[in-house]
Each structure stands twice: as structure tokens, then as C-alpha cells.
Design a protein with these regions (language model features):
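Alpha/beta-hydrolase-fold enzymes
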Residues: 149-151, 155-239
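Catalytic active-site module of serine/aspartate enzymes centered on a nucleophile-bearing elbow/loop
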Residues: 297-298, 305-337
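Cap/lid segment of the alpha/beta-hydrolase catalytic domain
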Residues: 63-116, 167, 171-182
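N-terminal cap/lid subdomain of alpha/beta-hydrolase-fold enzymes
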Residues: 26-92
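Short beta-strand/loop motif that positions the catalytic acidic residue
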Residues: 276, 282-284
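Catalytic-loop region of hydrolases
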Residues: 1-38
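Conserved alpha/beta-hydrolase "acid-adjacent" motif
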Residues: 289-295
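Conserved hydrolase catalytic core segment
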Residues: 125-164
Length: 337
């Protein structure tokens, strides 16, 4: 992992600012002489910059995103807790962690930081910009903000705006965090129980009825407690608490809520999408209840050069992370055209 420190004030879309920022990022492979082999991966909500680890089925030597052929970049987003400036970072003005005083950031603010890193790395054009879920939000915004620097787009399980359904889910998750009285305490562990509950809510939308019944149904019909499904959800909550922070989760859920490519651009999402002329591969997942295929179908109707593939998966929204074999096949076929 590498770190880029930008020592100047950065204005945020909501009117606040940060006195300086640090961006944690990872790179794989080598940039070629004419810098034409750059692939930039935008990550989702609780991921980090180590894309070759959490998307190992797609990225690596000999994989469809080949580290022997491409120069791959992934940057941790503003507001996260994996090295980039966020609630746990030290405010250079107060010399103490931001904690709950960290300002709201939008997807556009995250992309603004990505652009600063792009400039720092000397990248003039991105051959392929890709992301799933919240990563897709960043990719679309970036393509609008720097259209002439993006070659192709690969978007998975994502949408042009955050849906009312998504906002409602995020609100429920924030209510869970806010119910934990420790969540705004001056501590990295603040809100841990609330974060666990928020993750539990999220898991119900990342998966679905079919996969939960198939994987977590109890064979013992005489049980009165300690059900397999309950243990699974508890485990997922505990696992996230070990690696993430309630303040970042609360903040980034707000970032997702504000995702709307039409904001400040006239509001006509369909019209704005028509300006994204890049060759685009869209992946939708037939069992996704968080960002259903209707969202990708909308993108497909209004992006001039899009191709939509709907994959069969039992894993719902998480399919964009799990189904790397079939996704790799579709991406390889598309890139070869």
C-alpha cells in the first residue's frame, strides 16, 4: 500500500473543506511507455485499496485484469478507515482525530481525490475504469467529471442515482448505529454494537431469501434457539466490527444517499447518461434486491454504447464479488471485441 499526501485545502461539495488529505492506494503491474494500459478499480462501501485481494478472481497474473499486461490502481475512498483521510484521521488543525466532526463527503468528493492521485501518478488517460455497487457510483461520476480521460467503463450492480429503497436501508442502518450511545465517543471503538446491527441489516439486502434458506436452514426441527441463520448474521456483524469503524460506516452511507449524477446538472439523468459515450459493459444480477436489474436496464437504455449482461446468481448483490468466474468470461469477451 502507498500513500499520497495532498497538503492543500480541498473544498467539499457540501460547503465544508478539509485542510489536507491523504489517499491510501495500491498499484499492480507496470505502466507502459505510452501510459495506455491503466485500469482503475473503484471499490465499494467497506472495501480497501487492496483490490487484488478482495477481487482475486478478476485481478492477478493471467487473470482477465492481468497484472502482467496492465497497470492497475485502486484508491481507498475519502471517509473510509483504510488509510485515506477519514473520521479516525488526525485533524492537522486540532492535532486530534476528527471522529464525529469529520464533514460529510459525496461521491464527487471521492472522485475529486481520485483525480488528484491520478495527476500525482502522471496518468493522463484511463484505459478502463471499473467498479461495482458504490464503486460504480464513483466510476460514473468520474466519467462525467473527466470524460475525455476515460477510455472504457465496466459497471457492476450499480445505478445512476441512489434509490429510495437504498436510502431507506441506509437510514435503518444509521438508526442502528445511533442507538449505540458510544457511537460519537472520542474512540475508534465507538459505536461497535451499532455497527454490528447495521451490518446485520445490510447482509439481508446483500443476499436474499433463496441463498439464506439454502445455506442457513437448520436441519434440527426440535431447536428452540441458537439457529444457524442467527449465528451467521451475528458472525458477519462481529467480523465487520473487527475491521471497520462505525463513524466511517455512518458517513459513507450518507455519501451513497447523495449519489445522483443529475445533481447540479439539470436533473435529467437520462440526458446526462447520453453524454457518457464510452464503450460500457454493464453487469446486473438476477437475484439482486439491493440494486436490482431495473437499475442496470435504465443505464443500458440511456448509455449510447452500453452492453448489458444479466448473470444468474444465488448470491444477490454480493454476486458482483462472488461470481468472478462468469464475470471474468463476460469481461474477457467484451474487452476482446
Amino acid at each position: 500500500m502507498n500513500y499520497f499526501h495532498y497538503p492543500h485545502k480541498i473544498a467539499l461539495e457540501g460547503g465544508d473543506s478539509l485542510p489536507s488529505i491523504t489517499i491510501a492506494y495500491s498499484t499492480y503491474g507496470t505502466m507502459n511507455a505510452d501510459k495506455s494500459n491503466v485500469i482503475w478499480v473503484c471499490h465499494a462501501l467497506t472495501a480497501n485499496s487492496e483490490a487484488a485481494e478482495w477481487w482475486a478472481g478478476l485481478i492477478g497474473s493471467g487473470k482477465v485484469i492481468d497484472t502482467e499486461k496492465h497497470f492497475i490502481v485502486c484508491a481507498n475512498i475519502l471517509g473510509s478507515c483504510y488509510g485515506s483521510t477519514g473520521p479516525l484521521s488526525i485533524n492537522p488543525i486540532t492535532e486530534a482525530p476528527y471522529y464525529s466532526s469529520f464533514p460529510l463527503v459525496t461521491i464527487r468528493d471521492m472522485v475529486k481525490a481520485h483525480i488528484l492521485l491520478r495527476e500525482h501518478l502522471g496518468i493522463e488517460k484511463i484505459f478502463l475504469l471499473m467498479g461495482g455497487s458504490m464503486g460504480g457510483y464513483q466510476a460514473m461520476e468520474w466519467c462525467i467529471m473527466e470524460n475525455d480521460r476515460i477510455g472504457q467503463l465496466f459497471l457492476l450492480a450499480t445505478s445512476a442515482t441512489e434509490s429510495a429503497w437504498g436510502i431507506a436501508i441506509h437510514t435503518a442502518q444509521r438508526l442502528a448505529i445511533e442507538a449505540d450511545q458510544s457511537w460519537q465517543s472520542a474512540s475508534a471503538e465507538g459505536g461497535a454494537n451499532g455497527l454490528k446491527a447495521a451490518r446485520a441489516i445490510g447482509m439481508l439486502t446483500y443476499r436474499n431469501y433463496n441463498i439464506m434458506v439454502a445455506r442457513q436452514k437448520d436441519p434440527d426441527s426440535d431447536k428452540l434457539d441458537h439457529y444457524k441463520a442467527s449465528s451467521y448474521i451475528q458472525y458477519q456483524g462481529d467480523k465487520l466490527v473487527q475491521r471497520f469503524n462505525a463513524m466511517s460506516y455512518w458517513l459513507l452511507s450518507k455519501s451513497m444517499d447523495s449519489h445522483h449524477i443529475g445533481r447540479g446538472r439539470g436533473g435529467n439523468t437520462a440526458l446526462i447518461l447520453k453524454d457518457i459515450i464510452q464503450k460500457t459493459l454493464l453487469i446486473g444480477i438476477n437475484s439482486d434486491i439491493l440494486c436490482p436489474i431495473a437499475e442496470q436496464q435504465f443505464l443500458n437504455r440511456h448509455l449510447p454504447n452500453a452492453n448489458l449482461v444479466v448473470i444468474d446468481s444465488n448470491y444477490g448483490h454480493d454476486g458482483f464479488m462472488v461470481e468472478t468466474s462468469i464475470i471474468s468470461q463476460h469481461l474477457a469477451n467484451w474487452m476482446g471485441k
